[in-house]
Amino acid sequence: MQTVQERNDAVMPDKTPKKVYEPLQEKPVYDFFKRIFDLVVASAALVVLSPLFLVTAIAIRAEGRGPVIFSQVRLTKNAKPFKMFKFRSMCVDAEAKKKELQDQNEMQGPVFKIADDPRITKVGRFIRKTSIDELPQLVNILMGDMTVIGPRPPLPDEVAQYDEYQMHRLDVKTGLACYHECLGRSDSDSFDAWVEQDLKYIRERGMLTDIKVLLMMVKAVLSGRGAV
């Protein structure tokens, strides 16, 4: 015997539109040239920015105890885990303090972000605003874990909360700069908007698109807007 709810569902079916994701279009030629692009850009950037690496390391060390480089497990294409590198911009026990700040999360969805995060150090605030903290990921690019342009690499516990649609962010290799953040929207409180921009990039990805996003990244970093 049907319940009242089952009868109502039969008469009035759920009309909530389901998000449909187009199957990923394979682009082997693009993937080949993208890897060359990644190697050239990452290698050149490491050489040119090496003095900045040294100055940043000295500043972090001078501010207090703790490692200069912070490493963390992130996920890339097909949810493959890898160790991502960053200049440390937070206090040493930042991960432990994260649980105490969960109720202050300003980001909708699985991502944790608060505007005035008390865990960020003085040097850390500057290198985050200028995206200097992300530069060690150039090494991740050379190692093949990341690419210059692509969706930002998420944490495993974030991905554990993804629905099937959001999982498509990981259909391609994750990157140093993403379309969403280069538009100056890294502080957006909508994770869904972030996902939509990532999927838009995946659909339209190509060398011209990557060059366009790279130029947008440089402009965003120099202006201090939507820092990567």
Q: How would you name each of these model-derived features?
A:
Residues 36, 134-135:
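Alpha-helical packing segments of well-folded alpha/beta enzyme cores
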